Amino acid sequence: MSEMSYSIIVAEDDADDRLLLETAFRETGFDVHLVFAHNGVELLKLLTSPKRSFHPRVILLDLNMPKKDGRESLKELKQHPELKKIPVIIFTTTNNAAEISRCYDLGANTYVVKPDNYTDLLKVVNHLKNYWFETASVSEH
């Protein structure tokens, strides 16, 4: 499977953060199809649409979004028979032990605090590429 066939769905309400993520993926050479949802309602609608043309390898999920926040979305994802198998990475500015624990209890696969500078964001994207994609590809064979 080539990297080009990978899809990541990003649930993020902040336009600047979406643009930074898109730029970081491109700049690191991580050629992946990014699908953006602006809130939890849109995320679940995209994922459950019978016309969905992508199959995300990973979901990057912000916690603080309008309409349906990341916690509610995570809970619904993990209760859905098909969607519960997609790894969910919480990607948020919220950094406290109780929230991290709560997200793991709800079924998050990992929790990443958004870096406050672009250099660290590039490191996070490289980690995603190296761990969630290249490692998974080796184990698929």
Regions found by a protein language model. Name each.
Residues 42, 116-127, 135-140:
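C-terminal output helix
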Residues 5-16, 21-25, 59:
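Conserved acidic segment of CheY-like receiver
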Residues 12-13, 91-95, 115:
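Conserved active-site segment of CheY-like receiver
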Residues 61-62, 92:
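Active-site residues of response regulator receiver
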